[in-house]
Amino acid sequence: MKMELKVKPIENGTVIDHISGSKALKVYKILNIEEKLPITLALNVPSKKGVMKDILKIEGLELTKDDVNKIALISPDATINIIKEGKVIKKFKVDLPKRIDGIIKCTNPNCITNKENIEGKFSIEQKNTLKIRCEYCEKFINSIIISK
C-alpha cells in the first residue's frame, strides 16, 4: 500500500521551492529564521522534472532582497512563492544580481575586508557555474562564506 504524507499549506508566509537537492538546511541557516516561526522542511523530494529538490515553507516570514540574493547564491534555480491568506500572490525565480554587497565574506586572508571593518563587495562574473570576484582584492572565490 502506497503511503502519502500530506503537509498542511501555510496561510501567510514564504515557500522556497526547487531548492537544489540537500541544500535546504543551508538556506535555512543563512536566513537566520526566528525559532518560533512554524517551518516545514522537505528534503530530496522528486520533482516533476525527475530531479531531487528541497522545499522550505516558513509561516510568517517575508524575505528581504538580501535574503533572496543569499538563496540565489546557494540555489540559483530556487523559486519563491509569497503566500497571503492561503493563496500564492507572487511567484518568482531567484536571480543573482550583477553585484552583491555585504552578505559574502572574502576568502582571501590578505583582503582589506578581513583586516578592517569593511563590507565585502563582489561582482558576479558568471552565473551558471558560479564565479564571484572580490572588488577589493580581485580574488575569484568559489566557496561562499555568508557573512550575515
Curated annotation (Swiss-Prot):
One GO-annotated biological process of the protein: pyrimidine nucleotide biosynthetic process
What's one Pfam family here? Answer: PyrI
Q: How and how many cofactors are bound, per the record note?
A: Binds 1 zinc ion per subunit.
Keyword check for Ion transport: no
Which superkingdom heads the taxonomic lineage of this protein's source?
Answer: Archaea
- Entry's SUPFAM superfamilies? Aspartate carbamoyltransferase, Regulatory-chain, C-terminal domain, Aspartate carbamoyltransferase, Regulatory-chain, N-terminal domain
Cofactor (UniProt):
Zn(2+)
Please give the Gene Ontology molecular function terms for this protein.
Answer: metal ion binding
**Keyword terms:** Metal-binding, Pyrimidine biosynthesis, Zinc
GO CC terms on record? aspartate carbamoyltransferase complex
Annotated residues that bind Zn(2+) are located at C106, C111, C134, C137
Q: Which HAMAP family match?
A: Asp_carb_tr_reg (MF_00002)
Per the record, the similarity remark reads: Belongs to the PyrI family.
Protein purpose: Involved in allosteric regulation of aspartate carbamoyltransferase.
Quaternary organization: Contains catalytic and regulatory chains.
Protein name per its UniProtKB record: Aspartate carbamoyltransferase regulatory chain
Q: List the source organism.
A: Methanococcus maripaludis (strain C5 / ATCC BAA-1333)
Organism phylogeny: Archaea, Methanobacteriati, Methanobacteriota, Methanomada group, Methanococci
